[in-house]
């Protein structure tokens, strides 16, 4: 108990985190000790989310003996969907009928992802969330930083999943799709605005004419800078000769 209390990290108000051991494996801990640990945590917390190891093994079986509902995380890839379908089958074999699907890293550019096609492959009915692929999330993960959902668009995307965790009720699938589409639309709009060049503005040129028009966009690109770089490159080539 003392070791567990020391290992628990407070993340935010009403949210604690117990990191996995970096040395002990599931096989080393054993089912009995693991169940004892989770039951001890149940006496302290209202909700416990367990990040299960990938695949289907003894670790999953130990978890399924304890949980009241499952979130099956999968990707919009054929292999991942097949694995997700197998995970659902394992849940049913353990008499767990309360589960929701969380589609992770769903592409937002150039690919048409059909929610109902994925559900058909999984033979599932309830959707917990459609989580879009976002490079910012990868950066946060690599750097070990937490994402502030209060000021991020992911807050709305994850709202259906949070409701499922708290209440056990799933949103209608079209409402989940609507949240995802709204996120994608906003991202595309922000991207288009960032790439749109500004109008021409007066500025000094490399030719010394103060009235020469200097084209600048929001990314910092300028015709002046390119011309200067071109002249410098030409000068270097001539000097080398």
What are these regions (language model features)?
Residues 84-95:
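Conserved C-terminal guanine-recognition region of P-loop GTPase G domains, centered on the G4
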Residues 1-43, 140-143, 147-148:
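P-loop/Walker-type NTP enzyme "switch/lid" segment
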Residues 23-24, 55, 77-78, 105-110, ...:
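Conserved nucleotide-binding/hydrolysis micro-motifs of P-loop NTPases
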Residues 107, 119-146:
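Beta-strand-loop-alpha "switch" segments that mediate conformational coupling across diverse proteins
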Residues 42-59:
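Glycine-rich phosphate-binding loop used to anchor ATP phosphates in small-molecule kinases
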Residues 59-77:
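Inter-motif core of Ras-like GTPase G domains
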Residues 143-241:
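NTP-binding/hydrolysis catalytic cores, primarily Walker-type P-loop NTPases
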